Amino acid sequence: MFTVLDVSRWQGRIDWDTVKASGRVHGVMLRALGSRSGTPYIDPMFETNYSACIRLGIPVGVYYYSCAVTAPQRDAELALLHDALRGKRLQLPAAIDVEDARLRALTPDALSALVAGAARQLEHWGLYAMVYTYTHFADTALHMDTLAPFDLWLADYRGKRPARRHGMWQYTSRGRVPGISGPVNLSRTEKDYPALLHRAGLDRTIL
């Protein structure tokens, strides 16, 4: 079992040397994009966190917070994400964070088709695409059969491993890791994503 944490600007400045030395973390999902009133922006701590993790040999993946309800909005998010990722290498998946209440303006079929299109674009870039959401959103706002080709990163804090098929389970938002002030999200996965991506040739530099 592997432990993965995810961080964004809200964790502030992280002492990554201490995180690494703790031996508690096997990988990190960094927020690449946030959203401000529906407008995407590159997380201001992304570059700093990425550079530190690479320096220390901590496997890195990314996620971006999506508010897109149209194809042009989705494509604008992807264009900015590509700018953020160009020249970098990932050892963990690239995840689309699908949880914003504004996304409920779409039917489950329409939203799932939009998200699947984004995931296919990530794959076109040579990334391992993943979809992040929480259990109630998956049950009520998405058509999960449409998203079945992509690993699911599922948030569920009820203490029991979710029955829904998933690649990674975010089990708490109140984790504690040395080197990080305050609580942090923690996930578990049985998949050795760095080895999986390496075998598939998906850990190459993003062009």
Give short role names for the model-derived ranges.
Residues 1-26, 30-119, 123-125:
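Substrate-binding cleft of extracellular glycoside hydrolase catalytic domains
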Residues 1-18, 22, 26, 143-207:
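Functionally critical loop-and-helix segments that line ligand-binding/catalytic clefts
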Residues 37, 69, 138, 161, ...:
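Flexible, glycine-rich phosphate/dinucleotide-binding loops
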Residues 60, 128-129, 152:
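Hydrophobic anchor at the start of a short beta-strand
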Residues 104-105, 138-141, 163:
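Short catalytic/ligand-binding loop motif for oxyanion handling, primarily in non-cytosolic enzymes
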Residues 122-140:
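Aromatic-lined carbohydrate-recognition surfaces of secreted/lumenal glycan-active proteins
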